[in-house]
Amino acid sequence: MRYLRPLMQAGPARPRDAVALGWCWFTHVEVLSRTEPAQVIPAKDLTPEELARFGDPGTAPQLMGILNTTPDSFSDGGSFDTLERAVAQGQALVAAGADILDIGGESTRPGASLVPEDVEISRTAPVIAALRGAGVDVAISIDTRKAAVAKAALEAGASIVNDVSGFTFDADLAPLCAARGVPVCVMHAQGEPQSMQKNPQYNNVLLDVFDALHERVEALIASGIPREKITADPGIGFGKTQDHNLAILNRISLFHGLGVPILLGASRKRFIGSIGNAPNAQDRAPGSVAVALAAIAQGVAIIRAHDVAEHAQAIALWRASVAHPFA
């Protein structure tokens, strides 16, 4: 099998034969293989079927604001674990520019323990209902691996299900989402949170993650969820070393070949602190923004972020200075 990575560009100097993909375009693709050296070929040499594989990221990148209602999340655990503080933070994220709120009641940081369903529901459903009651009308995503939690969240007003297990943890979750007709995000993770960072191994991390996500996307489609309702996340930091993370980020446009939009969740992750000399997670906004802009330049559709205001400002300036004709 050959893997096709569009070499994304943005800006006004677009050749006539360029292939448009969201706010970006490309004239060449990098052909990757498990057995042959990588090579770059013109996009015009692709078959119509190969060109049709690439997912459209939409007209503009979106920001997903992170709202953890947990006592133990890696960067903000305990900050928003009361209803009042969680609602206030959700409103603040929307005011700062969040297009989506992603609400989670179970930490999936390395080493985290499983949270019982009833506890997770008590941490999330009331917050979602209160946000809707307060007039928050942006899309709300429930970050969960469990069907019962997702069901309660959807009934409270959520409209997206984001599963870090890739819909492998709970067999009832995909059928629930199919029956409700809601969009989903499927993420790649190797192993369980308790042990996923203990010496993760891959043959080729980029292609292994692509293949795993391709299998999950096709499984979700087979379960009744339309392709146009699926977003894929390569799962930065979930069973991956720093080198694994960087290999994915360097060639993240490969994941357009899944035929769905790409979501990136790298905000405040440990590798940003390591490279950027920021041991405190709250000090990693500049590095998080840098990673986000690099991803947007490769056509990533959704950026999941803690520091929404900083990301919103940076993205606005990136679009104005680099991709203005398409803004």
Predicted regions and their residues:
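Active-site-adjacent loop and "lid" segments of alpha/beta metabolic enzymes
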Residues: M1-G22, F74-Q89, T108-G133, A139-A148, ...
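Catalytic domains of carbohydrate-active enzymes, especially glycoside hydrolases
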Residues: A88-G104, Q298
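Short acidic capping loops at alpha-helix termini that bridge into adjacent secondary structure
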Residues: V138, P226-K229
